[in-house]
Amino acid sequence: AHIDSLFYKGGRVGELMFNTVYLPLSDKEHQVDIHLFRDRNEVAAINAYYKMGQTDYLDGNMNITDLPLEMVNPFIPDNMAKLTGALQGELAISGTASAPDVNGYVRMDSSAVYVTAVGSSFRFDKQDIRIKDNLIRFDKYNIYASGTNPFIIDGTVDIHNPSRMMANLKLTAQNMQLLNVKRNKESMVYGKLLVNLNSTVKGPLDALVMRGDLQLLGGT
């Protein structure tokens, strides 16, 4: 499949091409290879083997080479945010179709998000986010705002049950300059905001419980 140039609400997603090969190995065994291209550059490849039986079995791999995050921007409502950079990673999925095991990693390469409401960009760490035995592991993962002191995420997100993913995270920051924005027409707030944060976030993703301390520092 080939789309010359896909636009959504005036925003360009890109020239997209899907290359798919399906192999029926037997009545109950199937294999599929999928390659995704954006602007004629391969950005992701998926290969999967599926075996039907009393218990269906799945074995697959996904290789994300350089998936441009700007592809998402047209789908963000009201230009609330703008993403830059690329997503990279490798994922392996195996086991029963009803409860597969996921392992691998994802990485944000030179990636940031600009949030229009606060007129600020937040830069993502290039550190790998590991996934082992259906646990997404954040190992002191850093997010930077306008200053040099980061917002730090440490802990796990359990994806064993996709309909009820569970978080167990610690969020910290020390003397973090969260905002440094001059008055402008787009931002809802302006000025400087410096904070200390020491908190936990736990529970299902649709009902998170956050506890901790947030301090506004001098210079705000």
What are these regions (language model features)?
Residues 1-90, 98-200, 204-220:
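Interface amphipathic segments
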